Amino acid sequence: MKYLSIFLLATFALAGDAPISTDSKGSPSLIAKFEKTSKSNIEGTIKFTPANNGTVSVSVDLKGLPSDIGPFPYHVHEKPVPASKNCSATENHFNPYNGTVRAATPAAHEVGDLAGKHGNIMGESYKTEYDDSYISLNEKSRSYIGGLSIVIHANNGTRLNCANITLLDEGHGNANTTMSNSSSSSSQSAVNTSSSMASTAPQGNGAERAVVNGLLAAGVVGVIAALI
């Protein structure tokens, strides 16, 4: 019973609502371009542009979806798609605030769970637009999605197709250069409590943020262990 209590306490300490992000105004727009592959006919785009209030406007325009394995969940994943186009290499959902699946509120969802917050992709062709208050186009934000990827799943979780999130307007510069600059931004100084660590988490891409989350988890568990 003691260990169950410790586990629940650790889970509670690590999980938290994502803050509303209103820092995207003036940031470059991003896009995920889906192309047909030998295993998937899905093609189209998901665009991310700054909304007037600083949140993110999302525009989905897809076709070629299979007729018999929908509806289709889709998420921002924490790693980019490699040159091999292996969607499994994108690893887990983008989840900088340790949200949960099937959460009761949008803030409690994983930041990258677009389907959980806004509904699954439906039908063989699909178009929709919505604003998302929790992802960000600002490179300095913990919720920044540039350089990550989007994966479209079948209703059983199979990964059907995936695409990297890159700059929409090449006038802002080379997409790879921009994402690299974000990835190489310096880490901030460590602090003594997990809450302070969370509020000053380093900038960077999904790989760096996954490491930070792991360090936070280890720190909380260590504090709990010291108390028993």
From Swiss-Prot:
Cu cation binds at residues 75, 77, 93, 153. Monomer. GO terms for molecular function: copper ion binding; superoxide dismutase activity. Residues 1-15 form the signal peptide. One of its GO terms (biological process) is cellular response to oxidative stress. It holds the Pfam family Sod_Cu. Induction: Induced during yeast-to-hyphal transition and by osmotic and oxidative stresses. Expression is also increased when cells were grown on nonfermentable substrates as the only carbon source, in serum, and in the presence of neutrophils. Down-regulated by shikonin. Expression is controlled by EFG1, NRG1 and RIM101. It comes from Candida albicans (strain SC5314 / ATCC MYA-2876) (Yeast). Superoxide dismutases serve to convert damaging superoxide radicals, a key form of ROS, to less damaging hydrogen peroxide that can be converted into water by catalase action. Degrades host-derived reactive oxygen species to escape innate immune surveillance. Involved in the occurrence of miconazole-tolerant persisters in biofilms. Persisters are cells that survive high doses of an antimicrobial agent. Its EC number is 1.15.1.1. Belongs to the Cu-Zn superoxide dismutase family. Its cofactor is Cu cation. It catalyses: 2 superoxide + 2 H(+) = H2O2 + O2. It is a lipid-anchor; GPI-anchor. Residues 176-201 have a biased composition (Low complexity). GO terms for cellular component: cell surface; extracellular region; fungal-type cell wall; hyphal cell wall; side of membrane. Secreted in a disulfide-oxidized form and apo-pools of secreted SOD5 can readily capture extracellular copper for rapid induction of enzyme activity. Disruption phenotype: Leads to sensitivity to hydrogen peroxide when cells were grown in nutrient-limited conditions. Its main location: secreted. It comes from the Eukaryota. The GPI-anchor is attached to the protein in the endoplasmic reticulum and serves to target the protein to the cell surface. There, the glucosamine-inositol phospholipid moiety is cleaved off and the GPI-modified mannoprotein is covalently attached via its lipidless GPI glycan remnant to the 1,6-beta-glucan of the outer cell wall layer. Binds 1 copper ion per subunit. Residues 206-228 form a propeptide. This is Cell surface Cu-only superoxide dismutase 5. A lipid is attached at residue 205 (GPI-anchor amidated asparagine).
